[in-house]
């Protein structure tokens, strides 16, 4: 776990500069989390990539959160996307320009990032997993990662389309959305002197979106509460993903890296499937709300029972043992 965290931290440091900020209140702490998302979206627009961006959502009345390991404008599997384009009108057209077409072949330097963003317009999710083993998971072992990435896609889509009720989030964590941030917090963020500059967006398009001349101090003073800062965050989502859900690519990527050296072990790509995701969520929520019994793992993953802390009291496991015993006795009697 610790080695995996080091790998994630190394990747994050490639994109972001970490600055320590002291918080005095719960609202300050959450304000910092929202501020980091705003900065993450700005980084995505400016550089074409951001990492370790937190997202929140509400699933069947329950608050769910996660951290997106990577967002970028680079499609992880162009062939998969092209294949689905033939049967799905909402996928990119065949003449859509690839980000690689804007790379200088000799130096690999992006020539015109703004042109890339305008032409590709889609953002793709990547989840990074670290492993001690040199192999990557297959079959049932891959399912948790598949569902996790699809859930992150859903959470990001809901934020991009302003479907998340912030009051539910704030109530869940006992936060006062109208409470002003502490002077210390505003001063620290203001001293970072982060200027909101985005040449591709005309500030006249929306008076609520920060103009290029606004710095961190001015922005926080104008959005001096969680509710106000949340509204600014939603505007930044709108700015980054103007087409809403269609701004988010359906090709998802799971990247596996070694725990020790961070070397890439393998990559899996797949498509977001809303029906599969909804079926999974409905079933999980039924268990979470006590509307169904817990279900055990499939035979392929029965090895997990060996280190499960609930193994000794697991009724599902005991039932499977009883079923196997009865079946064995029946076979023995039939042979005799």
Question: What are these model-derived regions, one by one?
Answer:
Residues 56-283:
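Mg2+/Mn2+-dependent nuclease catalytic core
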